[in-house]
């Protein structure tokens, strides 16, 4: 269990809702994953209520919705989308995403920090997607973000924890929850993030594009459950040198006597 803002979640797996072939498969995958916090791109929501299908579907899942500002290219656009989400969905929670580079979808650190500061002052619970930059994460924490969401690797790349060394520093230094977001392509990578000390992970592409998204969602859920249990059990310390599991001193002393 971990806490974001004032809400506790049993599952450490946050899920994205893009790239699924059907709404039904998306819903089944959310259920299989056991996710309680699900992201939703505002650009996919028909705010006029005409042919919007995804929002009613997600509301039947009984999960907390986390709208995001995906598609925003600067702070002003992100502020507009966040306020639209608050009005349309009725939540002050927002996943802040600003990535003007459409090839790599890397977050803009300057605009992200600027937008985060304004959104917090406007009463939002802000969860910013950001680069794995320890200094930036400290700044985001200082302006009042409820968590930081540093990337493991580029969005949808399935490359895993390419930023592992920097993620470790962020986990050590940051006082708010750390949710590793983007690039996680396998359950083992999600497990590794938890074993490093991350509070949760957000996964979308690896589940949505799998041959069997529902089974893959379940696989991620099991991996994170194992990681959570291992974390609470206390992982053995890593050592540079070998450490014998059974001392041989007494046995060898007996050998010397027999000679």
Swiss-Prot record:
GO molecular function: thiazole synthase activity
Gene3D superfamilies xref list: Aldolase class I
Binding positions for 1-deoxy-D-xylulose 5-phosphate per the UniProt entry: 156, 182-183, 204-205
Enzyme Commission code: 2.8.1.10
SUPFAM superfamilies assigned: ThiG-like (SSF110399)
GO terms under cellular component: cytoplasm
Signal peptide (residue range): none
Alphabetically ordered keywords of this record: Cytoplasm, Schiff base, Thiamine biosynthesis, Transferase
EC primary class: transferase
GO biological process, one term: thiamine diphosphate biosynthetic process
Pathway assignment: Cofactor biosynthesis; thiamine diphosphate biosynthesis
Active site residues according to the UniProt entry: 95
Catalytic activity line of the entry: [ThiS sulfur-carrier protein]-C-terminal-Gly-aminoethanethioate + 2-iminoacetate + 1-deoxy-D-xylulose 5-phosphate = [ThiS sulfur-carrier protein]-C-terminal Gly-Gly + 2-[(2R,5Z)-2-carboxy-4-methylthiazol-5(2H)-ylidene]ethyl phosphate + 2 H2O + H(+)
Protein location: Cytoplasm
Family matches, as PANTHER family: THIAZOLE SYNTHASE (PTHR34266:SF2)
Known role: Catalyzes the rearrangement of 1-deoxy-D-xylulose 5-phosphate (DXP) to produce the thiazole phosphate moiety of thiamine. Sulfur is provided by the thiocarboxylate moiety of the carrier protein ThiS. In vitro, sulfur can be provided by H(2)S.
Self-association state and partner proteins as the record states: Homotetramer. Forms heterodimers with either ThiH or ThiS.
Stated family: Belongs to the ThiG family.
The protein, known as: Thiazole synthase
Classification lineage: Bacteria, Pseudomonadati, Pseudomonadota, Gammaproteobacteria, Candidatus Palibaumannia
């Amino acid at each position: 269990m971990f806490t974001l803002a004032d809400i506790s979640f049993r599952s450490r797996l946050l899920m994205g809702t893009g790239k699924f072939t059907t709404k039904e498969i998306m819903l089944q995958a959310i259920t299989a994953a056991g996710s309680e916090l699900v992201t939703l791109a505002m650009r996919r929501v028909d705010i006029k209520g005409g042919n919007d299908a995804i929002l009613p579907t997600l509301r039947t899942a009984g999960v907390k919705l986390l709208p995001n500002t995906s598609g925003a290219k600067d702070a002003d656009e992100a502020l507009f989308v966040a306020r639209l989400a608050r009005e349309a969905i009725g939540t002050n929670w927002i996943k802040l995403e600003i990535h003007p580079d459409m090839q790599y979808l890397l977050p803009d650190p300057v605009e992200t920090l600027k937008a985060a500061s304004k959104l917090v002052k406007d009463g939002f619970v802000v969860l910013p997607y950001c680069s794995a930059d320890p200094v930036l994460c400290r700044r985001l924490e200082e302006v009042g973000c409820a968590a930081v969401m540093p990337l493991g690797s580029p969005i949808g790349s399935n490359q895993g924890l390419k930023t592992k060394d920097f993620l470790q520093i962020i986990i050590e230094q940051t006082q708010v929850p750390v949710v590793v977001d983007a690039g996680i392509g396998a359950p083992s990578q999600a497990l590794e993030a938890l074993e490093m000390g991350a509070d949760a992970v957000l996964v979308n592409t690896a589940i949505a594009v799998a041959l069997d998204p529902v089974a893959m969602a379940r696989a991620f859920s099991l991996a994170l459950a194992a990681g959570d249990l291992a974390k609470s059990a206390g992982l053995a310390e890593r050592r540079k040198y070998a450490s014998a599991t059974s001392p041989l001193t007494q046995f060898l002393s007996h050998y010397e006597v027999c000679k």
